[in-house]
């Protein structure tokens, strides 16, 4: 607002005040400024508090406030201004539509001011710009009416004058005047604002000065609520000192920046002079030397088409940029990436591929896993016949610790090419895979281009780990990027955001790993050859420990192989009672724990040269066993209890089904143990089936009409789902109904139909491994799974009697 306009509105205020005083005198009343209505419309101010005796503009944009302004202009023109609390403003900002109803008792400060609207200007975009003259301090009492706009009742607050004007107060008053003028000189503020009030009026002086200081909302409100003029003088002086400290810090920062700029300008001037001198002398500078090196590297690359043109433009730009500019570094880094990428066609030489050598490498690095190795060798043999690895995408699925990642490294050794691994577990930003655009500060290429730069070949083996743990976010969908990366039709011209050039990655052999297929999108899954890896049985773990883990751990810890021997019984104990996971990570962890303790003993007592780990002294090194036989195997089984077999993403496990009966007026079944919908349906099917054959079982109908059957599966915190517990649940109901105990060491798995047919299930190998680990001797499985049973290695099946069934009636014959 221009100074002439301010002076004009100031004259309007003075005229209005003069008229009001004359009217007050004629009426015999004593009014300092205007009438003092106790009921006034309220306008909530979001920013800082407003003080009395000030002339300020306020922008009105909300419909509620505009209605309040229109209303008071038709009347006495008096409104009240109260400041909103920060808590309400934060809630309003976090609200999705940005609108919240104001609770005037809680959301505004209790002390505000009354003000007279002097002028209203309509804004082009809607809303008003009003100019008000603030009058008195008031305290919010209550809301009287809140229809189109709030009308509140207020109490007028009287300031407490100074009773005794002593030397201290005089010093404070003088300091306020002095510091205010000092701030004016720094801020270059117009001094006419001080002439709005009588300077001798200490209370008004405090209000005017506080209103001009850029302090916090809380500090301003504290001054507004201070009725004692004496206390208000002290608070305002504190604010003035804070303001001057802030000005001093700002000036210091500005001075530092100015000195830095002057130094940079001086350096630039000197560098330009040096550059001119070098040019006159014919001496080539460092930048020119760097440009020539970069150009020679790029000329040696096999660039074509779009890549050749784009890199040429970047090289030309590089020649003109100054070394001190930020863009110089960006362009140089980009060109260095270009020179480090394998633009030449470096395909794997499949003519030199030897199947026997490949088999030896896989056998050397991984024990057992015959089925997996065969699948890998078959897959690579096809690539040899095609003499190309284009479109080679393999997905290894299995529990943690079974060797998925290390198999990827072995495949790279088989193909005699480089290996690069990166994990996408937890990645939510597609830029991690496809790179950031160069416009961003600190931009980098994605993992694919980084891998090619590191391996320096365009036909490496890339292992993308933990693909099932990718998640989408507002930063993009990494799965969609992986579709582009893995699609043979698209990855011929893969375009990284940072590189921004087409790059052929079709010769890359992609291996992906996952613990589960459930979270992987079907379109992505269809592009891959899926190979399932199951967990290890105890015999395999012990053999792997002897051949691979123990030598590795001894070497890592500096212990000689003759200084420590493991008895077979100790390794069996570790496998069965300490490391029951399907992989080998826990097994290796316990071996490391033992070797570290032996290393300490060898250092402490050098007279003992060798130690032996046996079943008897194992607890001394790794503590008490983590696992024992399942509790229900240690105790006698009771009627209604049956052992089932389950499968998870991390391998198989045994599952106990418990049932009990209680007399109830509402017979039926009650299910607990955190069962999923499919398992609940299986329980209902089993209950209905057992009820339908109750006559054949010679079970009295009253069993189903009189009792509530409660079915529970222990470990209630663990979610359980799937149809494969159908025959197990039915067997539990039958055992309970006949009051007979199921034969010991019997486990079962199979889906049950409503008519009593037993249908195929999945995860058979993992379930058998879990059963064997827990000492199960008899397993009932669906006859439809015979093919799966035949594929399972004989060492896993040894010691277990398998009973293949087609119907529930065959299961019943095997129960007791």
From Swiss-Prot:
GO terms for cellular component: cytoplasm. CDD domains: RecA-like_Lon. It holds the Pfam family Lon_C. Keywords: ATP-binding, Cytoplasm, Hydrolase, Nucleotide-binding, Protease, Serine protease, Stress response. SUPFAM superfamilies: P-loop containing nucleoside triphosphate hydrolases (SSF52540), PUA domain-like (SSF88697), Ribosomal protein S5 domain 2-like (SSF54211). InterPro entries: AAA+_ATPase, ATPase_AAA_core, Lon_bac, Lon_bac/euk-typ, Lon_lid, Lon_proteolytic, Lon_Prtase, Lon_prtase_N. Belongs to the peptidase S16 family. PANTHER family: LON PROTEASE, LON PROTEASE HOMOLOG, MITOCHONDRIAL. This is Lon protease.
């Amino acid at each position: 607002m221009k100074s002439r306009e301010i002076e004009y509105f100031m004259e309007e205020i003075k005229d209005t005040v003069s008229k009001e005083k004359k009217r007050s005198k004629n009426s015999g009343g004593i009014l300092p400024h205007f009438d003092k209505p106790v009921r006034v419309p309220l306008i909530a101010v979001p920013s800082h508090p407003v003080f009395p005796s000030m002339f300020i503009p306020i922008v009105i944009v909300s419909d509620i406030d505009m209605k309040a302004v229109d209303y008071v202009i038709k009347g006495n023109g008096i409104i009240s201004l109260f400041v909103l609390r920060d808590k309400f403003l934060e809630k309003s900002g976090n609200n999705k539509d940005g609108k919240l109803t104001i609770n005037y008792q809680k959301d505004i400060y209790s002390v505000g001011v009354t003000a007279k609207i002097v002028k209203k200007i309509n804004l082009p975009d809607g809303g008003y710009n009003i100019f008000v003259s603030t009058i008195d301090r008031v305290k919010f009492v209550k809301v009287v009416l809140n229809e189109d706009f709030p009308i509140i009742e207020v109490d007028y607050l009287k300031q407490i004058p100074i009773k005794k004007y002593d030397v201290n107060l005089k010093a404070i008053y003088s300091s306020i005047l002095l510091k205010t003028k000092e701030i004016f000189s720094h801020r270059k503020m117009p001094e006419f604002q001080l002439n709005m009030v009588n300077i001798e009026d200490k209370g008004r002086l405090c209000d005017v000065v506080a209103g001009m200081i850029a302090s916090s909302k809380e500090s301003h409100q504290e001054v507004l609520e201070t009725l004692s003029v004496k206390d208000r003088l002290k608070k305002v002086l504190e604010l003035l000192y804070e303001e001057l400290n802030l000005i001093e810090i700002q000036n210091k920062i500005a001075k530092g920046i100015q000195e830095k700029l002057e130094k940079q300008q001086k350096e630039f001037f000197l560098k330009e002079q040096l550059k001119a001198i070098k040019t006159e002398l014919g001496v080539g500078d460092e930048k020119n030397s760097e440009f020539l090196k970069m150009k020679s590297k790029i000329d040696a690359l096999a660039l074509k088409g779009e890549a050749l043109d784009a890199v040429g433009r970047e090289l030309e730009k590089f020649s003109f940029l100054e070394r001190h500019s930020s863009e110089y570094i960006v362009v140089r880094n980009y060109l260095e990436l270009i020179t480090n990428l394998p633009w030449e066609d470096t395909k794997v030489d499949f003519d030199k591929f030897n199947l026997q050598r490949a088999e030896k490498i896989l056998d050397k690095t991984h024990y057992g896993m015959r089925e997996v190795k065969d699948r890998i060798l078959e897959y690579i043999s096809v690539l040899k016949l095609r003499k190309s690895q284009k479109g080679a995408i393999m997905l290894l699925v299995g529990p943690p610790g079974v060797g998925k990642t290390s198999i990827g490294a072995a495949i790279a050794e088989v193909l005699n090419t480089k290996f690069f691994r990166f994990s996408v577990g937890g990645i939510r930003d597609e830029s991690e895979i496809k790179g950031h655009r160069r416009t961003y500060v600190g931009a980098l290429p994605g993992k694919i281009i980084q891998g090619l730069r590191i391996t320096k070949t365009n036909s490496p083996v890339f292992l993308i780990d933990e693909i099932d743990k990718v998640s989408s976010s507002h930063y993009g969908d990494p799965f969609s990027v992986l579709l582009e990366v893995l699609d043979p039709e698209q990855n011929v011209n893969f375009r990284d955001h940072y590189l921004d050039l087409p790059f052929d990655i079709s010769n890359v052999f992609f291996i992906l790993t996952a613990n589960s297929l459930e979270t992987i999108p079907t379109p992505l899954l269809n592009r891959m050859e899926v190979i399932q890896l199951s967990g290890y049985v105890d015999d395999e773990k012990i053999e792997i420990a002897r051949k691979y883990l123990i030598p590795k751990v001894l070497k890592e810890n500096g212990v000689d192989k003759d200084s420590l021997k493991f008895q077979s019984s100790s390794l069996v104990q570790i496998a069965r009672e300490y490391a029951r996971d399907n992989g080998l990570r826990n097994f290796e962890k316990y071996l490391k724990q033992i070797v570290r303790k032996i290393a300490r003993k060898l250092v402490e007592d050098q007279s003992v040269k060798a130690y032996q780990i046996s079943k008897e002294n194992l607890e001394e090194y790794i503590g008490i066993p983590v696992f024992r036989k399942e509790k229900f195997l240690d105790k006698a089984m009771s009627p209604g209890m049956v052992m089932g077999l389950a499968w998870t993403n991390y391998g198989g496990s045994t599952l106990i089904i418990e049932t009990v009966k209680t007399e109830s007026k509402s017979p039926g079944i009650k299910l607990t143990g955190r069962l999923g919908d499919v398992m609940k349906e299986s329980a209902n099917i089993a209950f209905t089936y057992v009820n339908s054959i109750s006559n054949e079982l010679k079970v009295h109908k009253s069993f189903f009409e009189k009792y509530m059957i409660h079915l529970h599966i222990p470990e209630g915190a663990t979610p359980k789902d799937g149809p494969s517990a159908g025959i197990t649940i039915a067997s539990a109901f039958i055992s309970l109904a006949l009051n007979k105990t199921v034969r010991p060491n019997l486990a079962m798995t199979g889906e049950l139909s409503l008519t009593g047919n037993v249908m195929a299930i999945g995860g058979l190998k993992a379930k058998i491994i879990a059963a064997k680990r827990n000492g199960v001797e008899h397993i009932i499985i669906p006859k439809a799974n015979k093919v799966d049973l035949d594929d399972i290695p004989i060492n896993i099946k040894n010691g277990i009697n398998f009973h293949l069934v087609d119907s529930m009636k065959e299961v019943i014959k095997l129960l007791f």
